[in-house]
From Swiss-Prot:
It comes from the Bacteria. Keywords: Cell cycle, Cell division, Cell membrane, Membrane. Residues 425-434 have a biased composition (Acidic residues). It comes from Staphylococcus aureus (strain NCTC 8325 / PS 47). This is Cell division protein FtsA. GO terms for biological process: cell division; FtsZ-dependent cytokinesis. Pfam families: FtsA, SHS2_FTSA.
Length: 470
């Protein structure tokens, strides 16, 4: 893989998304993307191998055409389903004065993988919380420091069920590409949070097609994560049943007229739907539709609150960040703001061509890949000038409502809803995005990774996969 190209694959329940990006000084420049809708994935996992493989193959081809990049290697996103999050430490010794480099950091992190004692799981991500040089000097990045005796790391660990890992990788590599590494959504979500949110304690809610994923960050690090088998498909099912129409029609009206906050929905927007048990068509208003949507989205949020309670997380001072495909619905922010006391925002990636919440996971996978490359010294060159990319952040004024559940001061009693509206985010069918950059010029100006660094990346995950089948 060329040093400046990162390719991520997000295998979601409704679609497979591929992003080709490159690192520049302040972030990621998206070169091209592909998206293919599929029925081969259920609850975030492979349901029909052949259908899923074809969707992955198609979206890789689309991203390759859009970016002008011959895609051979990818970084794969994995869902939170079947994962365990815990803390671990490891230490390596030095017997002479040693300047710490990326190889030493990789060695001390890799040692944690061998300590995994959760049966039938494989460690996929080890993220350093702090390094300790010579047992007393705590640092965030020890590269270029001199160690006389030891390097210790205290890290967070994400392990996933081996069967999930094997099947996901097998399906992707059946498309003729190599998986360089995998990153859990639990870790990826950290890149969509501000430093303040991560420090104070923030909850990410990713409402997808079949699954809603929840991750909580505090003091700058991932604390825990979980998933709920209730999401966008359940909203559509409720609409289909409530309006007595087909699932396909319900999905269409959800995207065109859907509103998750009843008090802000319009009774002037009228649409008609065909009935499943007759040839008649019936008229409904957006407010009629919102009645079904609000009830289900509210239930999803209540399930999220239950997850936080089960994890013992009673403070969400950094706020709630909602993303994923169902975050496109109007009124989601208003509804959650009406249920909690802390701030709420909808996260949408800022990069041109992927400004939809459903691309959050795919672009975050690239962010994670770059972060680890820099930590391990794989990436040493910045090819771009300093270009500031400012992300839109939606704030909600702090509210002093009483807590509805004792001890959970982010949860508040239902109050009179305000009649406010959100700007609708357009949702289109399968698209291939291409940036306005001159890709030919990029190819001429950039270099390939040196062979030794490429070997490091390739062998790292190959060794992991071999160990799974031993």
């Amino acid at each position: 893989m060329e040093e400046h190209y990162y390719v991520s694959i997000d295998i979601g329940s409704s679609s497979v998304k591929t992003i080709v990006g490159e690192k520049f000084h302040n972030g990621i420049n998206v070169i091209g993307t592909g998206q293919t809708y599929t029925s081969g994935i259920k609850n975030g996992l492979i349901d029909d191998f052949d259908i899923a493989r074809q969707a992955i193959k198609d979206t890789i081809k689309k991203a390759s055409i859009a970016s002008g990049v011959d895609i051979k290697e990818v970084f794969l996103k994995l869902p939170i389903i079947g994962t365990e999050v815990y803390d671990e430490s490891n230490e390596i010794d030095f017997y002479e004065d040693t300047e710490i480099n990326g190889s030493h950091i990789e060695k001390v992190l890799e040692g944690i993988r061998e300590k995994n004692d959760v049966q039938e799981t494989e460690v996929i991500n080890v993220f350093p919380i702090r390094f300790i040089v010579d047992k007393e000097n705590e640092v965030s990045d020890p590269k270029e420091l001199i160690a006389r005796h030891s390097l210790k790391v205290e890290a967070g660990v994400i392990a996933i069920q081996k069967s999930i890992l094997i099947n996901m990788i097998k399906c992707v590599e059946a498309c003729g590409v190599d998986v360089l590494d995998v990153y859990s959504d639990a870790y990826n979500y950290g890149s969509i949070l501000t430093a303040t949110e991560k420090e104070l304690g923030a909850c990410v809610i990713d409402i997808g097609e079949d699954v809603t994923q929840v991750a909580f960050y505090e003091r700058g690090e991932l604390v825990d994560a979980d998933s709920i088998e209730m999401a966008g498909r359940d909203i559509t099912d409720d609409i289909a049943q409530g309006l007595n129409t087909s699932y396909e029609t319900a999905e269409k009206v959800k995207h065109q007229y859907g509103h998750a906050f009843y008090d802000s929905a319009s009774d002037q927007d009228i649409f008609t739907v065909e009935q499943v048990d007759s040839d008649e068509t019936v008229q409904y208003t957006q407010k009629d539709l919102s009645d079904f949507i609000e009830a289900r989205v509210e239930e999803i949020f209540f399930e999220v609150f239950d997850v936080l309670q089960d994890l013992g997380l009673t403070k969400v001072n950094g706020g709630f960040i909602v993303t994923g495909g169902s975050a496109n619905l109007l009124g989601v922010k208003e509804l959650l703001s009406d249920m909690v006391s802390e701030k709420v925002r909808i996260h949408t990636p800022s990069q041109m061509g992927i400004r939809k919440p459903e691309f959050s996971s795919a672009i975050s996978t690239i962010s994670s890949s770059i972060a680890f490359d820099e930590l391990l010294d794989y990436v040493t060159i910045n090819y771009h000038d300093n270009e500031e990319t400012e992300e839109d952040v939606i704030d909600v004024k702090d509210k002093d409502n009483e807590s509805k559940l004792g001890g959970f001061d982010w949860f508040k009693r239902k109050t009179n809803k305000k009649d406010t509206h959100e700007n609708e985010v357009e949702s289109t069918d399968e698209e291939i995005y291409q940036s306005e950059d001159n890709h030919q010029e990029h190819k001429q100006n950039h270099e390939h990774v040196q062979d030794k660094d490429k070997d490091k990346e390739e062998s790292k995950f190959k060794k992991l996969m071999k160990s799974l089948f031993e």
